[in-house]
Regions:
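Glycine/Thr-rich beta-alpha phosphate-binding loop at enzyme active sites
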Residues: 27-29, 34-43, 177-187, 222-278
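Glycine-rich beta-to-alpha transition loops that act as phosphate-gripper elements at the mouths
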Residues: 65-68, 143-145, 207-213, 284-295
Length: 305
């Protein structure tokens, strides 16, 4: 019934509207104590805890940035058994993003194409939401960015401020490689390093799925030079050749945007495998992108995530 009736009906509704409705339901669920207790008991994974530096993960399965952009429901999401959750991407000032519709399903490929444009409510709203965090229950990351990626001074000031502002609640931070030019990002990370000495929260670089393998040595060297603690591999891809089941007309109709979901799994695994073999062993490597089932998760672990 789900595949033949329910799913086709749901897929007629705009993907972002479905996402927003799920967020609303999670906000309602927040106040349903007995149901939350039951949910936690049902989704309590029988997994071996994992420790890295001073972070204690209840398990190795997390939720990437992009779902909880406003950091408004990470506590409720943790009831589903995630060992860590990443909120964001967050910028100092509100970003409306690109016009809707901006998230599209390609069900034949088990993929989404998104061109949201880093929409988020800004620092103050996210900070208010972060105050609901329950320490020790899960690891919480925050993906941060600047409103002015082309302005070195503003980018440095904004990202350093976000790192400091969220430090009471964030267990780690992520910055997207490619969202800021390397020469500006270098200046940003030099400034953040001074704050990091005081605050001590780790910083990861999230790499895009299309990063050339031959560029990874340079990125690893950059990361070591700037005291980066690890990598998340990978984010979306622009490579339309990955969409082997959708028609050209369907892909053209959707238009621009990054591909996420199953089609990017092999690119993600390739990057994870290279990082695992060549990055310093003390760096944490988190596999992301294309993980849809336990089979993909196992492949990520085998690759070194």
């Amino acid at each position: 019934m789900y595949k033949s009736i329910i799913r086709p009906c749901l897929f007629r509704i705009d993907a972002e509207k479905i996402h927003d409705q799920i967020i609303t339901l999670l906000h309602i669920y927040r106040h349903l104590g007995p149901i939350r207790s039951l949910t936690r008991s049902l989704f309590h994974p029988k997994a071996v805890p994992f420790q890295w530096q001073n972070l204690n993960f209840s398990n190795r399965v997390g939720l990437s940035a992009g779902f909880d952009k406003e950091a408004s429901c990470f506590d409720e999401l943790s009831d589903l058994g995630f060992g860590f959750i990443e909120a964001g991407t967050v910028t100092p000032h509100k970003v409306d993003g690109n016009p809707s519709p901006r998230i599209f399903r390609l069900p034949k490929d088990h993929a989404l194409i998104s061109r949201t444009g880093f929409n988020n409510p800004g620092k103050e709203m996210v900070l208010q939401n972060l105050r609901q965090k329950q320490n020790g229950k899960y690891i919480l990351g925050v993906n941060i960015n600047t409103n002015y990626p082309a302005d070195e001074e503003l980018a440095r000031t904004e990202i350093t401020d976000l790192y400091s502002t969220f430090s009471e609640y964030a267990d780690y931070y992520t910055i997207n490689w490619g969202s800021i030019a390397p020469e500006i990002l270098s200046s940003v990370l030099i400034a953040v390093a001074d704050k990091k000495k005081q605050i001590g929260k780790p910083i990861f670089l999230k790499l895009p799925a299309d990063v050339p393998i031959e560029k990874l040595d340079d990125i690893i060297s950059f990361a070591r030079q700037h005291h980066i603690d690890g990598f998340i591999a990978t984010g979306p891809s622009q490579d339309r050749s990955l969409l082997i089941h959708s028609s050209q007309a369907e892909v053209t109709h959707v238009g621009a945007g990054g591909i996420s979901g199953l089609p990017i799994i092999y690119k993600s695994i390739e990057v994870v495998r290279y990082l695992s073999a060549h990055a310093p062993k003390e760096m944490l490597i988190i596999g992301a992108g294309g993980v849809m089932t336990p089979a993909e998760a196992t492949s990520m672990l085998n690759a070194g995530a």
